[in-house]
Amino acid sequence: MIAYKQFTLKVLHIAPECSPLAKKGGLGDVVGTLPKALKKQGIDARVLLPAWPGVIERAQEMGRLKKEPIGEISVALNWRAYTASVLEAEVNGTHIYLLDQPELFSDPCIYPEKLDASTVLPFIFLSFAPFELLRLTGWKPQFLHAHDWTTAPVSAALKWHRYYSYFNGDYDTVFTIHNLAFQGIIDPYVLEGWGFSPKAFSNLDMDSMEYFGQVNMMKGAITTTEAFTTVSPSYSDRKRVV
């Protein structure tokens, strides 16, 4: 009799917050608890999180942190390579990958007061990092789950990025809206430096990131992801647009 290995669904959450390591609002609570709930359903759910100031120290105190990085990843942005060390931790039963990149992830407040080409760069790195991380680890999830505008470019990259679009078909994506008020709206000149093709900002394509002459990162996620959700059914009802 042939014994078949049981199929395990794998999900990687990409987010700027994950309680208790980094939390500014409800997003951190969701990302901190959802993987544990999925694990109870037999799903291998992990988190990719920036190592903001204090995160590594908290991971050491609250869980198990491997002493040495498992490797490095590099992402090309604005015609230069940004390199991050990748650390692994387990906190409250959740497997977490930490991106240690002090140049980008140095703001203890996490979110910038104003969006411009420099202040959004940490979140673009975070959005592109999964594609490099998964080659490093050899762990391949079926789903990449992005949260809010800060990781909205994950699914957009699979459609329009000059390099990462080659991974289209390798992963399905899910996008969760936690706060519709912040959509990641920025001047369009940044797209070329991030590696997006001109199609990402075509006013002839309603699915593009173009939004009244600006880039709307959340719109790009909604139109390119396989599935999008809101943080709760009641939030969906309040924000529904016909």
Regions found by a protein language model. Name each.
Residues 1-242:
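Catalytic cores of nucleotide-sugar-dependent glycosyltransferases that transfer UDP/GDP/TDP-activated
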